[in-house]
Design a protein with these regions (language model features):
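Conserved HGGG/HGGXW glycine-rich cap/lid loop of the alpha/beta-hydrolase fold
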Residues: 48-101
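Active-site loop/oxyanion-hole signature of alpha/beta-hydrolase fold enzymes
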Residues: 93-136
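Conserved hydrolase catalytic core segment
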Residues: 127-173
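Flexible "cap/lid" loop of the alpha/beta hydrolase fold
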Residues: 156-200
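Conserved alpha/beta-hydrolase catalytic His-Asp/Glu region
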Residues: 193-252, 260, 269
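Short beta-strand/loop motif that positions the catalytic acidic residue
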Residues: 273, 279-281
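Conserved alpha/beta-hydrolase "acid-adjacent" motif
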Residues: 286-291
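Catalytic active-site module of serine/aspartate enzymes centered on a nucleophile-bearing elbow/loop
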Residues: 302-332
Length: 332
């Protein structure tokens, strides 16, 4: 194939004009344009490649996801309206989503993830940030605040917990509220061990039967209330980092946390958090409102919002209430 060469004068003109054109385009995007440019990449954080995704304008709002072992994807498209006034910085925690997975699962700890969040903040030159954590991400956000609150302007804790002991008590009550038939079915599956069953490709995750029983019949009333996601599939929910999940959550099912997340006992230390804090929870949340109330009582500069007709996915059940709660809090 014949390749045509650029004429040198034309090439020189292209080189001169390209940066100016790009700069002009960026200015247009940043000055009231309806176009929102997305940026993504990786930060080498303590030897682990952490994926980040940036979208929006304004002060940085750093967002950490739950699971543990999920990814930032479940926030979208629901948090997109916040990008109009805030620079949203999503990350996938180590071992999750697009971030690097570890050969040694013992490296999956809250403490290590705190250092990853800090490394991302420093590498991206974000300065002081608002940190928003949902579910497990809320526990991670608390751990970060307990060590690095000088780097926070605000803290937002969504559908989370500060005491794993208290969370396990919530799960006991959740099980007791199930039908006797479902309780027995889940008990039988958990008693026989949740891993190592089925086909070779199934042995390192929950069986389909358990996913349906636990994440479908068991959890669903606590995930959604007002706007149940018609695309929710408990089996699809199993697409996550299983080695991480087993290390952190544990191996004995959805209704007891007995992995290294047992270390999450922060309640008595929360009084040291002095940054303005917003605590969000659904009235039918998997992380019961009593857990949010316990955090609210300990953090002096906190505001508690309980969303009506909302489960764990508050920003899905009550998207406008969620947006207004976050934006009004950050305006103060």
């Amino acid at each position: 194939m014949k390749i045509r060469r650029c004429f040198p004068p034309l090439l020189a003109l292209c080189i001169v004009l390209a940066p100016r054109y790009a700069q002009s385009q960026n200015q247009n995007v940043n000055n009231g344009s309806p176009v929102y440019v997305q940026q993504e990449g990786f930060v080498d954080a303590n030897g682990v490649m952490i994926y980040y995704r940036i979208l929006g304008r304004g002060e940085p709002l750093l967002i950490v996801h739950g699971g543990p072992g999920a990814s930032h994807d479940y926030f979208l498209p629901y948090l997109l309206p916040l990008a109009r006034h805030h620079k949203l910085v999503f990350i996938d925690e180590r071992g999750s989503g697009r971030s690097q997975k570890l050969e040694d699962a013992s490296g999956y700890t809250v403490e290590n993830m705190v250092e990853d969040v800090e490394a991302v903040r420093v590498a991206l030159r974000l300065g002081q940030v608002t940190l928003l954590g949902h579910s497990y991400g809320g526990a991670l956000a608390q751990a970060y605040a307990l060590k690095y609150q000088k780097n926070l302007s605000h803290l937002i804790l969504g559908s989370t917990w500060s005491s794993t002991k208290a969370l396990n008590e919530v799960f006991i009550r959740m099980k007791q509220n199930m039908s006797p038939e479902l309780q027995q079915r889940i008990h039988n599956l958990e008693s026989s061990g949740l891993f190592g069953h089925g086909k070779d490709y199934e042995k390192n995750r929950y069986t389909t039967e358990y996913m349906v029983a636990a994440w479908g019949e068991g959890y669903f009333p606590y995930l959604y209330q007002n706007r149940p996601d018609p695309n929710y599939d408990p089996v699809d929910n199993g697409k996550m980092s299983w080695e991480l999940y087993r290390e952190m959550w544990g191996e004995h099912g959805e209704f007891v946390v007995d992995g290294n997340l047992r270390s999450v006992e922060y309640t008595d230390r929360l009084s040291t958090i002095k940054v303005p804090t917003l605590i969000l929870v659904g009235d039918h949340d998997e992380c019961d409102p009593s857990l949010a109330e316990a955090m609210h009582q300990k953090i002096a500069e906190s505001k508690l919002v309980v969303f009506p007709k909302a489960g764990h996915m508050t920003f899905v059940d009550q998207p406008e209430m969620f947006r207004k709660a976050v934006e009004s809090f950050l305006m103060k």
